[in-house]
């Protein structure tokens, strides 16, 4: 990050660190730009395990068409601890988000679908339904596990 050391009291991220492949470099850079006593807080999508995603998760990521570099809670814990952070906390939000995503899928497939298709195009809405079906599946399996991440620079 193009900031001087110790520039910030807080670094916050929402749904963006999923696109950074090197979580150790991320943690080190966040640590560098925080002032002593500073906090890191993020909400992002994690994968439940280290290593390659399952076929179902790979198909979901492919459907999204994004460059996800998902890491496990353990990988984040290790990266932030090794960078020097204390009080590293990861809170799994899968149960909450699974419920939300399932309701969104029901809505996409329900009575609103025709109007959505008229407004946004049938092909687009059909693709959204495909994505949400895959998303709900990997959420239900627990492999896709959105988390809140918090850590403190001593």
Features from the language model and the residues they span:
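Conserved Class I S-adenosyl-L-methionine
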Residues: 89-154
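A short acidic, Gly/Pro-enriched loop at the edge of an enzyme's catalytic core
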Residues: 1-11
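A short SAM/SAH-binding and catalytic strip from SAM-dependent methyltransferases
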Residues: 9-22
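A short glycine-rich, Lys/Arg-flanked "PGG" loop and its adjoining helix->strand segment in the class I
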Residues: 24-39
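A short hydrophobic/small-residue beta-strand
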Residues: 40-41, 87
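Alpha/beta-hydrolase-fold catalytic nucleophile elbow
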Residues: 14, 43-44
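Short alpha-helix
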Residues: 68-84, 90
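Short, glycine-/aromatic-enriched active-site segment of Class I SAM-dependent methyltransferases
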Residues: 45-67
């Amino acid at each position: 990050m193009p900031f001087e050391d110790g520039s910030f009291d807080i670094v916050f991220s929402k749904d963006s660190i999923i696109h950074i492949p090197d979580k150790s470099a991320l943690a080190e850079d966040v640590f560098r730009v925080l002032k002593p006593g500073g906090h890191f807080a993020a909400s992002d999508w994690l994968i439940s395990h280290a290593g390659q995603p399952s076929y179902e998760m790979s198909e979901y990521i492919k459907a999204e068409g994004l460059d996800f570099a998902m890491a496990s809670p353990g990988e984040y814990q290790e990266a932030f601890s090794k960078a020097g952070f204390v009080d590293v906390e990861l809170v799994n939000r899968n149960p909450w988000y699974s419920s939300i995503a399932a309701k969104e899928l029901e809505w996409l497939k329900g009575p609103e679908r025709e109007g959505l298709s008229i407004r946004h195009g049938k092909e687009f809405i059909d693709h959204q339904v495909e994505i949400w079906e895959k998303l709900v599946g990997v959420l239900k399996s627990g492999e896709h596990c959105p988390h809140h991440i918090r850590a403190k620079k001593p």
